[in-house]
């Protein structure tokens, strides 16, 4: 009798698992051993059934190649969520995380701009990890931040957490001291690389980026507002030498003319978007197509939309109200870190505002009519703890 009840209970458990799979693309940890059951039918997304391949393998194959998705009524985003549900079943999804991942599943050149406490860095690390582990032996994911300290505090910290919390044994070889997660021990080409790109590290980072040659390349630039333009320029070399290239730029909006602002510029100009615009197509990118910008506004945080603090790591109504009272709703800081949008003309105290510069087309460069003169200025910074600064300029008649 006990044996019969045991079989019945086992069958009921299996049926419950099948129903959960049928009703949700987020399959959770139940798939971990489902492939061992002869009664469980794999979703192969157009691939032939191969002995030994699990549901996770087919999700990864489908995510990389997009094969059979329309026929299977599935999207790359579905594959991504399925992979996450198998590998990290405890990850909590929210509206902003879904939008962020969706933007990367649908576009090759993506900018995320917006408020603090929006989960941008975690989302970037999660996407990079999933993207890489799907084909680690032919893939390089380059994650940059301004300094080594900020790299370890932000992006690499999230990579470490994902590595240690993975349900299955993590693939590859983690070398934390070098901020590298190699496909195999000693592989300096196919890996997740964490690079600092500022404060004396720019030339080395550019050389490292330009030296990467593999089939799949993903670039994630965190703190993009303070990232040297040379890092953005170095990506052109990568695009020309790989089969699949993707780029994500993350930052809090500061200026239309810093690297993050230029990468995020709407294809129809800044006048075509406003503080209520949540996403837009950007200028033509290396692939000849417009990029995509997704914006996170603290006033539309999932916690505020829900009317309660469900996600403690995202902006809350209490935090937003406190910042509004402390800084004022029209302060540059409130625009940058809370509204997540570029401050309107007149808010920043500058000699020439960006509206005037845009009107006079200053960003398009100059045509000099006569001989030009190159000038330079240096602040040696003998005291006060500041770093020395050297700048060059050209002057002449336009």
Please identify what each model-predicted range represents:
Residues 2-378, 390-397:
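Phosphate/NTP-binding elements of NTP-utilizing enzymes
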């Amino acid at each position: 009798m006990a044996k019969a009840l045991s079989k019945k209970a086992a069958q009921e458990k299996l049926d419950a698992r099948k129903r959960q799979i049928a009703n949700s693309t987020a399959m959770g940890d139940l798939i971990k051993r489902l492939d061992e059951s002869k009664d469980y039918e794999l979703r192969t997304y157009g691939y032939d059934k191969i002995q030994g391949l699990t549901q996770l393998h087919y999700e990864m194959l489908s995510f990389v190649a997009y094969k059979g998705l329309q026929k299977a009524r599935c999207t790359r985003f579905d594959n991504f969520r399925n992979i996450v549900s198998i590998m990290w079943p405890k990850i909590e999804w929210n509206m902003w995380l879904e939008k962020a991942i969706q933007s990367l599943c649908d576009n090759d050149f993506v900018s995320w701009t917006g408020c603090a406490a929006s989960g941008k860095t975690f989302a970037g690390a999660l996407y990079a990890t999933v993207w890489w582990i799907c084909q680690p032996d032919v893939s390089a994911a380059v994650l940059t931040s301004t300094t080594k300290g900020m790299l370890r505090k932000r992006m690499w910290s999230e990579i470490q957490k994902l590595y240690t919390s993975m349900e299955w044994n993590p693939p590859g070889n983690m070398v934390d001291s070098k901020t590298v997660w190699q496909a195999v021990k000693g592989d300096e080409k196919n890996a997740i690389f964490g690079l600092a790109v500022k404060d004396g590290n720019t030339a080395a980072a550019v050389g490292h980026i330009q030296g990467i040659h593999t089939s799949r390349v993903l670039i994630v630039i965190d703190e993009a507002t303070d990232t040297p333009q040379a890092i953005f320029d170095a990506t052109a070399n990568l695009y020309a030498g790989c089969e699949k290239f993707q780029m994500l730029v993350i930052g809090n909006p500061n200026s239309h003319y810093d690297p993050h602002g230029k990468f995020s510029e709407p294809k129809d100009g800044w006048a075509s978007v406003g503080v209520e615009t949540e996403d837009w197509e950007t200028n033509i990118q290396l692939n000849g197509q417009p990029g995509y910008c997704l914006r996170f506004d603290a006033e539309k945080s999932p916690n505020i939309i829900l009317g309660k603090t469900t996600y403690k790591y995202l902006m809350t109504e209490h935090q937003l109200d406190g910042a509004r009272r402390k800084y004022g709703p029209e302060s540059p800081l409130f625009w940058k870190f809370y509204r997540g949008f570029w401050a309107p003309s007149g808010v920043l105290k500058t000699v020439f505002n960006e509206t005037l510069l845009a009107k006079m087309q200053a960003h398009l460069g100059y045509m000099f009519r006569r001989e030009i003169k190159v000038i330079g200025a240096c602040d040696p910074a003998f005291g006060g703890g500041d770093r020395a600064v050297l700048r060059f300029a050209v002057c002449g008649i336009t």
